[in-house]
Amino acid sequence: AYIGLVYDGNQPLSFLATPGAKDVGIELHSTSKNFNMTGWRCGFVVGNQLLVKAYGDVKDNSDSGQFLAIQNASAYCYDHPEITKSIATKYSRRMDKLVVVLQKSGFKVNKSGGSFFLYMSSAKAAVKTDGKRIEFKNGEALSQWLIREKLISTVPWDDAEPAIRFSVTFAAEDEADEDRVISEIESRLSNVKFEF
């Protein structure tokens, strides 16, 4: 789903490019992330012929296909890869700016190589400029504090370690509006430093 959203000279890498992969696996592609069509549930499957057929059999018995207009819109997107390149450029630009703001606040974070998510270890504490210290036992606690106290939406990601996830999919009309959003995040975090 994210294969086309890569940055900084990285090239999309297909599982099927691995020698022998076509003999043992399949790859699912979707319009949801590459073309900002989340929820449209349209894509395709490639790979091992037997597995593709088995996947088709499951799909035949679980749903009845997509509305033709969605299929046509998806086909248009696949014929226009520049759409994904434009989206990736936008997300890369936003990611660069968000990383700088988060690093200023003490987050240990680097730009990801792709997608629109920015994962990072959860802070153990936040220290306000007045000296007040707030401790977080995990990403869930930090995420809840960020939404309640700073009105910044994140997703806790505590499956492997205490972590949170930011996204650069926020609504913005143009690059100036993106800068406004990033500046607002910076302003909301300006009176706190995070400890790890």
Where are these regions (language model features)?
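PLP-dependent class I/II
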Residues: 1-196
